[in-house]
Amino acid sequence: MGSYQSEKRYYLHIQLLDIVPPIWRRIVVPGAISLHTLHKMFQVTMGWENAHLYLFRLTINEKTTVYGLPDPDWDDAGLRIRDSRRTKLDATVWAEWLKLTYEYDLGDSWMHQITVERIEHVADESVYEDALWITPRCLAGERACPPEDAGGVGGYTLLLEALQNPRHPEHEQMRQWAGMSYDSELFSVQQVNSALANLD
């Protein structure tokens, strides 16, 4: 991932909704990035594989604006999607109280709540030389995200039931489908930051 000169850095909390125990991450990113770049960072941070469409939704005073990748061949159901590649994070989410939702895989509809925990302003341009100010990184998190195409929250719940019960009639089948090494409790900050450092 390239370096970013930014007057702000954002501390974000990302949580996958409707799953208990929660699957969440805390990351810090430069404010100057586009929402599309933020999407790519979320993919790496959460553990998704960037195999499906996505949408950001920002609601202010009961008005919702939707961001994503406009596609003339896709029926957007009148959402009037704004191009996330041309939309900067710091120009869109300009206050800490704003909440953003991120939907990944419009079929499975994985909904993530994005909370801005803190926005820090760069006081001295010399800090641009400090990679901590301009390099996205993960600070903390818990649990692995579901496998791709698990069927949304309902399908994921059934998958865990099968994986956690060796006597379940679909235990072996689900182990093979999810990957023999899949562990729903596994999460590594170090692995995420290594992947972020190599993100194109």
Annotated model-derived regions:
Residues 1-200:
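Short linear regulatory motifs enriched in tryptophan with gly/pro/ser
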